[in-house]
Amino acid sequence: LGTREPEVYGRATLADLEREVRSEASSLGVDLTWFQTNHEGAFVEAVQALRGQADGALVNAAAFTHTSLAIRDAFLAVKVPFVEVHLSNIFAREPDRRHSRLADLAVGVIAGFGPAGYGLGLRALVARLGER
């Protein structure tokens, strides 16, 4: 992140993004656990670990968004509310990237706002959790 296709994903690094999300979480008074992986199995295990440990999740499944039934099944099993976030507008990209296997399970989807989408997603998730 920060170097791959900056015209699509921007120049913010993963560390920049984490710092911004942690700052937003602090201002909202919520605890945050940060997790990143490039491995589908590790992603599934992280989702499964949410049960009983988290009230909600902010998720960017990257390319797994379009392909992973395993991650979808993990979210179906844990029933933890989540917001799906994407740096780019996946719905305006090439056809293979326009379909999300997670969107219908998410409480909402935020796409195309770059790093700001994470703060938007976190605020929306906290608001939704406050309605329960």
Task: Give the positions of each predicted feature.
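Glycine-rich phosphate/diphosphate-binding loop of Rossmann-like nucleotide-binding domains
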Residues: 1-28
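Short beta->alpha junction loops
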Residues: 31-41
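Short, glycine-/small-residue-rich phosphate/pyrophosphate-handling segment
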Residues: 33-34, 92-132
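Short acidic active-site motifs
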Residues: 42-46
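Short acidic/histidine-rich motifs immediately flanking catalytic phosphotransfer sites
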Residues: 50-57
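Short glycine-rich anion-binding loops that position phosphate/pyrophosphate groups of nucleotides
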Residues: 62-65, 88-90
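Short Gly/Thr/Asp-enriched flexible loops that form oxyanion-binding sites at enzyme active sites
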Residues: 68-77
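Short, acidic/small-residue loops that bind anionic groups at enzyme active sites
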Residues: 76-93
